[in-house]
Amino acid sequence: MKRTLCLIATSCFVLFSAVSQSAFAVTLVPVGNRNVSQPGVPAASAKRTREMNTTYEAKYQKIYGLLKSDSKLRSKIASVSRTYGIDPVHVAGALIGEHTYNVDAYDRLQTYYVKAVSYLKQGLSFDYKGESIGDFVKRPQFAECNKFKDSLRLWSCRENVWDNNFRGNTIGGTSYPNNRLSAVFFQPFYAGQSFGLGQLSPLVALQMTDMVNRYSGLPKLDADHATEVYKTIMDPDLTLPYMAATLKHSIDVYRRVADLDISKNPGLTATLYNTGGADARARALANINAQRSANGESLQMPEENYYGWLVNEKVDQLKALF
């Protein structure tokens, strides 16, 4: 009798293990683009490019030229990528996308260092109508976020509270724009601006600061010290770890939440670097695939946007750099 029970228990364990491995198997997302032709480029990007009297191809060649000609920059990208356990082509892809579609690259890396120093001379602060972000997040609506100790979940929670309570509303006599928290509180120059070689927003830097502290040993950033935040995202030596951390997080969250490995597809990591919201996008795709699996359908793969599409098109050139 005991032997029979043992056999049954063993069989059940083997069956459970097989089911568990199947349920949690991670699928490698194929390399390359899912879309045959490039998805549409936003009108704002096209307008900026026309105003600068240039073309996307010219802008691509400019940032690619910077990467190709600056061996020190390539070395820094390779080094930081090793630290964060990602392929350097992910960092290069994010740089290519940002400087092709969002801004125009400077010809030399030294220009970014000069710009970083100039920011230290400006008395910057993160506030809205005289209320600092530090005071703003002490409001009772944000109390639920205090349980989070890591910077990513803390600031992500605060973003959600902003969207659900303040965005587009009038609270206590103060009207708040129907815009992102990042654009309202974290852009002292003009809304929607990102900065530096990696074109990071201050809010993303604040979200990633704990990971960067853990992996690179850089000091943690504080929203009450805006100048240091801007110095970090403007200085190439400091911003590269934040780029790598952001890309690593996208890879990690898709593996953990959606059971998808996007580490071999730099077009997808570039897309997420461009759009943000990797956590929410991974959850949405996981829900879609759970339903598809229940219906006996194949998995839906994540798709690149216009920005990531270019990266995958140019991936052989980018890989050759390293």
What are these regions (language model features)?
Residues 107-108, 113-131, 264-322:
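Catalytic and substrate-binding regions of cell-wall glycan-acting enzymes that process beta-1,4-linked
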Residues 78, 88-95, 270, 274:
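Short, well-structured alpha-helical segments
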Residues 1-9:
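Bacterial N-terminal signal peptides that target proteins for export
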Residues 24-78, 103-136, 228-235:
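N-terminal export signals and maturation junctions of secreted/periplasmic proteins
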Residues 148, 156-163, 176-180, 187-263, ...:
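Alpha-helical segment that forms one wall of the substrate-binding/catalytic cleft
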Residues 14-23:
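C-terminal segment of classical bacterial N-terminal signal peptides
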Residues 88-95, 99-210, 224:
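Acidic/His-rich structured neighborhood in mature extracellular/periplasmic domains
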Residues 63-74, 83-88, 106, 142-145, ...:
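Solvent-exposed, acidic/flexible segments
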